[in-house]
Amino acid sequence: MKHLSLPNDSLRNVLLLSAVFCTLCSLPVHAESDVDEAPLLMLRFSKEHSDTEEHWANMLSILRQYPECCDEVWFSTGTTVPPLEVHAAHVEMMKRGKADLQRLGIGTSVQVQMTIGHGDSSHTPAGWEAKTWTGWTGSTGVEARYCNCPRQPEFLNYIRAMARLYAEVHPRTVWIDDDLRYDNHYPATRDSRLGCWCATCLKAFSDEEHRMWTRETLDQAMASDPQLATRWKAFSIESLRRIAEIIAQETKAVSPETRMGYQKTFWDEDSTVVRVILQTLARVSGQRVDYRPGGSAYYDRKHPAEQIVKSMDAARFMRVMGCPDYVATWCPEVESWPRHYGSRTAQSVLLEAFTGLAYGMNAVSMYVTDRWEETPELQARSMIGPVADGADVLRRYAHANRATEAVGFRCDGDDNHPLYEFGTLGIPVLPGMGRSLGTLTRDELSPVSIYGEPSSAVQRVRQQMDERAPSPVLCLSPYVGLLIPRVLADGTLRTVGLLNGRIDTQGPIRLCLRSLPSDVQKVTWRELRRRPVRLKIERDEDGVAYVSVPSVGAWNAGFLEIGTVSRK
């Protein structure tokens, strides 16, 4: 892999001119070798999964039962600031764990789960013995004691030493968690402007501004000076960038083959900091980097449809970012919090993962196992086993989608909820990268209520949209759910994803398949946690192909695999 040449000018200039270089580009088609080396299904662990021999033995026993559940495990550095000797001992545990995983054919990455810190509500005093520096402080003067000022030398030295220790594991990727952010560090950030407002940060900013600022004078001045607020934001992002740079430098010094990754939310306002961090990681490591967009929708009780929209939001953020070539892996955050039995089901994990792959993600990050408040037997039976049961379909789907793009109608706004509702009519929609059939207004996205109109009215809308912009696939049966065609560069239909939006089985579902080569004889329906079904292709007098999917299970998904897909 050649080293990437990225700009290393003053970050201040980069941030102020970010709108200039934030150009959209098409989804890069990676070399086959690059794709083959990348893990698809990644299982994130907490530190408690590997901090003792007993805990690791419990987790390893589950993975031995269901090794197909994942291609890679992320070990965690933890979310506290213990003495470095504690980290050193954990590194030795990780090394032994990595050897255990290798025997199962599972790779290893490391997640730096604490840089700035997540917030005081997430922590107790235990485990913070090494913290001798000030916490993150808001513009109101409130300090988050279990978070860290990003510029204090003692903290940066600690991060440097910690990163060098964990690099000894020689992981595939070092992932920096989403606490590397300039907001959401409770209670400091409540009713606060962004950034850390401690004495250290205020002095550093004052030195750059050649003017002495206090917390009160800076806050007051920002109220009427947007350029000052912009410079403060650039300063705050630079604070984060330096931390990412240190971690990447220390990792490369010990393990130059290791890649770097970043986890961050996918709201539009995040695009600048995400781009700056990822560019820094790519420049320092000399390799393409990995990115995990995410945020919210952690429970089944309230969020089953939100989990689908969340993957659509991740796809949309890929488009907002312009899908830069220095990012190799896009993996949605499929997460449960808390990770208890009642929080989330394996079925919803699989559906969110499937949706991410349908709309352009090329990997899946799953954080769904508990820290041993639930028994290993329950976690194996209720989560890891069912995920393993659906893993083959996810792998086949990702493989079949290589070098393809999704096709559908775009939305003219930044909210994917109307697009999702419209998509449940069985009309292809496109939240992210892909081949657009046109952009619809909000009024056009609400032509009929799928819940209050007969199926004949829904079918008329499908026909009208198809006449407006013919899709590679037209649904001809009563169906409530997403329909996602993916095509090759020449327009040839490659896969058709279906996600049943009802809590009952649907089918049969008759589909008209356009752009299907005349020599294609094999179409296989592959549904999550079901046996594959070979489908008969019918052709009319014009050679247009039709198939009938016999059924799609309640709140389940699957795809039509067109032709034979060879897998290494």
Cite the ranges covered by each PLM segment:
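Catalytic domains of carbohydrate-active enzymes, especially glycoside hydrolases
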Residues: 52-81, 168-172, 352-363, 425-431
